[in-house]
Protein backbone atom coordinates (compact mmCIF):
# COMPACT_ATOMS: atom_id res chain seq x y z
CA UNK A 1 0.00 0.00 0.00
CA UNK A 2 1.29 3.44 -0.92
CA UNK A 3 -0.01 6.29 1.20
CA UNK A 4 -0.31 9.81 -0.14
CA UNK A 5 -1.26 12.68 2.13
CA UNK A 6 -2.18 15.51 -0.22
CA UNK A 7 -1.83 18.20 2.43
CA UNK A 8 1.66 17.04 3.42
CA UNK A 9 3.15 16.52 -0.04
CA UNK A 10 5.02 19.38 -1.64
CA UNK A 11 6.72 19.70 -4.98
CA UNK A 12 10.14 19.78 -3.28
CA UNK A 13 9.43 16.52 -1.46
CA UNK A 14 7.21 14.17 -3.43
CA UNK A 15 4.80 15.45 -6.06
CA UNK A 16 1.18 14.52 -5.46
CA UNK A 17 0.38 11.85 -8.08
CA UNK A 18 -3.24 13.01 -8.42
CA UNK A 19 -5.56 15.66 -7.04
CA UNK A 20 -8.63 14.79 -4.97
CA UNK A 21 -10.53 18.07 -4.68
CA UNK A 22 -12.30 19.33 -1.58
CA UNK A 23 -15.62 19.17 -3.46
CA UNK A 24 -15.08 15.48 -4.29
CA UNK A 25 -13.92 14.59 -0.77
CA UNK A 26 -16.86 16.44 0.79
CA UNK A 27 -19.37 14.65 -1.47
CA UNK A 28 -17.80 11.27 -0.69
CA UNK A 29 -17.98 12.08 3.04
CA UNK A 30 -21.67 12.95 2.64
CA UNK A 31 -22.37 9.67 0.79
CA UNK A 32 -20.48 7.63 3.39
CA UNK A 33 -22.44 9.34 6.18
CA UNK A 34 -25.69 8.49 4.37
CA UNK A 35 -24.60 4.84 4.12
CA UNK A 36 -23.85 4.78 7.85
CA UNK A 37 -20.61 2.83 7.37
CA UNK A 38 -17.51 4.84 8.35
CA UNK A 39 -15.23 2.06 7.00
CA UNK A 40 -16.14 2.86 3.39
CA UNK A 41 -13.51 4.31 1.07
CA UNK A 42 -13.91 5.60 -2.49
CA UNK A 43 -12.21 3.37 -5.06
CA UNK A 44 -11.49 4.97 -8.44
CA UNK A 45 -10.45 2.60 -11.20
CA UNK A 46 -9.85 2.32 -14.93
CA UNK A 47 -11.16 -0.60 -16.96
CA UNK A 48 -11.42 -1.49 -20.61
CA UNK A 49 -14.60 -0.35 -22.31
CA UNK A 50 -16.49 2.72 -23.36
CA UNK A 51 -16.41 4.26 -26.80
CA UNK A 52 -12.76 5.40 -26.47
CA UNK A 53 -11.16 2.22 -25.11
CA UNK A 54 -10.97 2.83 -21.36
CA UNK A 55 -13.54 4.01 -18.87
CA UNK A 56 -13.50 5.29 -15.32
CA UNK A 57 -15.30 3.57 -12.49
CA UNK A 58 -16.21 4.57 -8.95
CA UNK A 59 -17.25 2.26 -6.14
CA UNK A 60 -17.17 2.10 -2.37
CA UNK A 61 -14.87 -0.44 -0.77
CA UNK A 62 -14.13 -1.39 2.83
CA UNK A 63 -10.84 -3.14 2.05
CA UNK A 64 -7.46 -1.64 1.17
CA UNK A 65 -5.55 -4.01 -1.11
CA UNK A 66 -1.80 -4.47 -0.94
CA UNK A 67 -1.23 -2.74 -4.31
CA UNK A 68 -3.54 0.22 -3.59
CA UNK A 69 -2.39 3.80 -3.39
CA UNK A 70 -4.34 5.55 -0.64
CA UNK A 71 -4.95 9.29 -0.47
CA UNK A 72 -6.44 10.88 2.64
CA UNK A 73 -8.42 14.08 2.16
CA UNK A 74 -10.80 15.75 4.63
CA UNK A 75 -11.28 12.51 6.56
CA UNK A 76 -12.00 10.45 3.43
CA UNK A 77 -9.78 7.80 1.83
CA UNK A 78 -9.44 7.46 -1.94
CA UNK A 79 -8.11 4.12 -3.25
CA UNK A 80 -6.48 3.51 -6.63
CA UNK A 81 -5.13 0.08 -7.62
CA UNK A 82 -1.71 -0.21 -9.26
CA UNK A 83 -3.05 -0.91 -12.77
CA UNK A 84 -5.36 2.11 -12.69
CA UNK A 85 -2.70 4.29 -11.06
CA UNK A 86 -0.58 4.38 -14.22
CA UNK A 87 -3.52 5.86 -16.16
CA UNK A 88 -4.45 8.36 -13.44
CA UNK A 89 -1.08 9.94 -12.57
CA UNK A 90 -1.57 13.70 -12.72
CA UNK A 91 -5.37 13.46 -12.88
CA UNK A 92 -7.80 15.59 -10.90
CA UNK A 93 -10.79 13.86 -9.31
CA UNK A 94 -13.54 16.42 -8.74
CA UNK A 95 -17.26 16.63 -8.06
CA UNK A 96 -19.40 19.01 -10.12
CA UNK A 97 -23.01 20.02 -9.55
CA UNK A 98 -24.12 22.28 -12.40
CA UNK A 99 -26.63 22.56 -15.25
CA UNK A 100 -25.32 19.28 -16.69
CA UNK A 101 -26.14 17.47 -13.45
CA UNK A 102 -24.19 16.27 -10.44
CA UNK A 103 -21.33 13.85 -11.01
CA UNK A 104 -17.75 12.95 -10.23
CA UNK A 105 -15.44 14.21 -12.97
CA UNK A 106 -11.88 13.17 -13.81
CA UNK A 107 -9.60 15.61 -15.63
CA UNK A 108 -6.88 13.34 -16.95
CA UNK A 109 -3.78 14.80 -18.65
CA UNK A 110 -2.87 11.30 -19.90
CA UNK A 111 -6.02 11.00 -22.02
CA UNK A 112 -5.33 11.75 -25.67
CA UNK A 113 -9.01 11.55 -26.63
CA UNK A 114 -12.22 11.45 -24.63
CA UNK A 115 -15.79 10.70 -25.58
CA UNK A 116 -18.52 13.32 -25.51
CA UNK A 117 -19.84 12.26 -22.13
CA UNK A 118 -16.34 12.27 -20.58
CA UNK A 119 -16.62 8.81 -19.06
CA UNK A 120 -14.24 7.04 -21.46
CA UNK A 121 -10.83 7.91 -22.86
CA UNK A 122 -7.82 6.62 -24.75
CA UNK A 123 -4.10 7.04 -24.15
Curated annotation (Swiss-Prot):
What residues bind iron-sulfur cluster, as annotated? 51, 115, 117
Cofactor(s) for this protein? iron-sulfur cluster
**GO terms for biological process?**
iron-sulfur cluster assembly
- Matches recorded under InterPro entries: FeS_biogenesis, FeS_cluster_insertion, FeS_cluster_insertion_CS, FeS_cluster_insertion_RrpA, HesB-like_dom_sf
* Pfam families, A to Z: Fe-S_biosyn (PF01521)
Query: Sorted alphabetically, which keywords does the UniProt record give?
Result: Iron, Iron-sulfur, Metal-binding
Q: How is the cofactor bound?
A: Binds 1 iron-sulfur cluster per subunit.
- Give the highest taxon in the source lineage: Bacteria
MF terms from GO for this chain are: 2 iron, 2 sulfur cluster binding; 4 iron, 4 sulfur cluster binding; iron ion binding
**Record-annotated disulphide pairs:** none
Which HAMAP family does the UniProt entry name for this protein?
A: Fe_S_insert_ErpA (MF_01380)
Quaternary structure and partners: Homodimer.
What is the recorded function of this protein according to its Swiss-Prot or TrEMBL entry? Required for insertion of 4Fe-4S clusters.
NCBIfam families, from UniProt? iron-sulfur cluster assembly accessory protein (TIGR00049), PRK13623.1 (NF010147)
Name the family the entry cites: Belongs to the HesB/IscA family.
Q: What is this protein called?
A: Putative iron-sulfur cluster insertion protein ErpA 1
Amino acid sequence: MNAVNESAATTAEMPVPFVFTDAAADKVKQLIDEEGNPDLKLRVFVQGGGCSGFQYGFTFDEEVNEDDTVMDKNGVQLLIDSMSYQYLVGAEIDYKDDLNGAQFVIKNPNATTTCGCGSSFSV
